[in-house]
């Protein structure tokens, strides 16, 4: 799952996640057998972390979102991306959510099915006529609705949906009836975990799943995330809301590309791009260079301190091989420590996102983060390799 990213600088996000949750997330992403990886709790943690690995990679090239939303679990990634909660607390919250949902699925077994080629109204009618515990769980796109409930009720609603014109019914390989009242048993544990999170006002608009509205008040998000467990994901309406905010380019970060396809159906006039592996960054940069993504992606992320993961320390790495020469203006005042002299800075220089920290050969090295230089990791005149750490920063904007 995560192997394409293992040699990318953003892979360090995985170590931060492992430290935050006390689990070997790298093993989960690289070596876990499919049976283990697809367990609800593991799948949610792996997806969350990999999505933020991709977000980190996107922000390393100088882009940050102008608005955010996430489908189901993705809402947690969206809140981290918008600066509304710290990465470490988000990771711990995802673990609590996954465990709670897995237990709820055991207590109240259920399943889900995608109905293709049917309207929202007909999908709702199929659920009502089934006369069992079945509800619409996802309003994904025009002509695509997901229903969830007990196995018998979902089967009955699926047959009624076929009678109402559904072209196809696709049973989903899930371990519970997510986003329905059958998940009610998960809410107490999630509420408790939400109480431990220090939510902040989002730095950019975040549109919620449960009502497809922007919520800027941080005190509202615990209730919204709790309600999401038992209420439908209104994804089609969410894309419409983002379009109403002026978005014409949508970027999906993380494994797969399902949301990209859904977005194209919800907003056919918009540009939708998926970044799932490092090679996809080139297509993203091509889109930005063509001026197509300026509405939803800020180029150069000063307003977000260069990143949204709020990790305490980061490194700037060499983009290529060659001789490293540091930027002379970054000498640490009062320490006698020259730039590029490996060692600690007791009175560190401050750098902003995009600042020049040196050159490798003729290639400029600019920091994708804002923070304080606390240690030079390569000395002036040293021959460095691509990906070799050059300078160690304590990032600004961290939230502990």
Question: What is the meaning of each model-derived region?
Answer:
Residues 1-123, 168, 172, 249-279:
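FabD-like malonyl-/acyl-CoA
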Residues 299-370, 374:
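Acidic, low-complexity mobile loops and tails
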Residues 356, 362, 389, 395-396:
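Short, surface-exposed secondary-structure boundary micro-motifs
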Residues 271-295:
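Short, flexible loop segments at boundaries between secondary-structure elements
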Residues 19-23, 33, 82-231:
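Alpha/beta catalytic cores of group-transfer enzymes, especially the acyltransferase/condensing modules
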Residues 372-390:
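Short, compact, well-ordered microdomains
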Residues 59, 162, 240-246:
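Non-catalytic positions within long, well-ordered alpha-helices that form the structural scaffold/packing
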């Amino acid at each position: 799952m995560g192997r394409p990213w293992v040699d990318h600088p953003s892979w360090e996000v995985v170590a931060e996640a492992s430290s935050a949750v006390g689990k070997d997330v790298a093993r989960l992403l690289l070596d876990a057998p499919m049976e283990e990886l697809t367990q609800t709790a593991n799948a949610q943690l792996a997806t969350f972390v990999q999505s933020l690995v991709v977000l980190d990679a996107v922000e390393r090239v100088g882009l940050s979102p102008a608005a955010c939303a996430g489908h189901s679990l993705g809402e947690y990634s969206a809140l981290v991306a918008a600066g509304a909660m710290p990465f470490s607390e988000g990771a711990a919250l995802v673990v609590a959510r996954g465990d709670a949902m897995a237990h709820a699925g055991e207590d109240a077994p259920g399943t889900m099915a995608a109905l293709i080629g049917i309207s929202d109204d007909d999908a709702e009618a199929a659920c009502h006529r089934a006369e069992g515990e079945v509800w619409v769980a996802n309003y994904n796109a025009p002509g695509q609705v997901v229903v969830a409930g007990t196995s018998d009720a979902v089967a009955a609603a699926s047959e009624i949906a076929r009678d109402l014109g559904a072209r196809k019914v696709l049973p989903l390989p899930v371990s519970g009836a997510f986003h329905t009242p059958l998940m009610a048993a998960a809410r107490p544990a999630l509420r408790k975990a939400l109480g431990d999170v220090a939510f902040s006002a989002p730095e950019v608009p975040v549109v919620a799943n449960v009502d497809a509205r922007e919520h800027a008040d941080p005190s509202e998000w615990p209730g919204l995330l709790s309600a999401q467990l038992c209420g439908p994901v209104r994804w089609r309406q969410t894309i419409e809301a983002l379009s109403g905010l002026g978005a014409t380019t949508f970027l999906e970060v993380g494994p797969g590309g399902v949301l990209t396809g859904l977005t194209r159906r919800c907003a056919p006039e918009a540009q939708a791009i998926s970044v799932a592996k490092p090679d996809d960054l080139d297509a993203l940069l091509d889109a930005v260079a063509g001026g197509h993504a300026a509405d939803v992606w800020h180029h150069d992320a000063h307003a977000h301190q260069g990143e949204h993961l709020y990790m305490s320390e980061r490194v700037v790495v060499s983009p290529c091989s060659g001789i490293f020469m540091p930027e002379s203006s970054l000498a640490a005042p009062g320490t006698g420590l020259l730039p590029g002299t490996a060692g600690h800075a007791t009175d560190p220089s401050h750098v902003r996102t995009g600042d020049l920290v040196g050159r490798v050969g003729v290639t400029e090295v600019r920091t994708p983060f804002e923070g304080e230089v606390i240690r030079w990791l390569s000395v002036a005149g040293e021959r460095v390799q691509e990906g070799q750490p050059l300078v160690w920063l304590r990032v600004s904007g961290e939230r502990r």
